[in-house]
Amino acid sequence: MKFSHALLLASSLAFFACGGDDDDSPTGANSRYDCSVTGGVKVVYPTISEQFKIGQEITVVFGTDIEDNGYKIVFKKNASDMGVDLLEEAYDAVMDGKTCNEVKVKLDAKRGVEPTLTGIIRVAPYNKQNKGNNSELFIVKE
């Protein structure tokens, strides 16, 4: 009887130790985020009050149902900033209105990313900019 209790305890501890929920990246975005959207773009990551550093690579997660030839990922230092494109070329997204697209981008000072308390990622169809959408506000430090 004691052996079975010890075995049960050990297996429970192993289950929790292998969880992976402590990871900061949005791995398995379809299961962690609701990317469902109708008639536009929905940016689900980064979320509000996230903190990043200049030079850090982050994963932008978004859903869309707007058919286009690609998507722009733009960093804005505040709501009124025009922003800087973080990609060399347009991103080819899955546009079914339910899939979470994950795009790795670098917050690179060489591209114009600056420290800010009001950073925004804007994801927009390349040819239909008015259908784009912004992330929540986040922080970028030196």
Model-based region annotation:
Residues 2-9:
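Sec-dependent signal peptide recognition
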Residues 11-12, 28:
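Residue-level signal for mature regions of secreted extracellular proteins and peptides
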Residues 15-17:
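C-terminal motif of bacterial Sec signal peptides marking the signal peptidase cleavage site
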Residues 21-142:
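Extended, solvent-exposed regions of the mature portions of secreted/cell-surface glycoproteins
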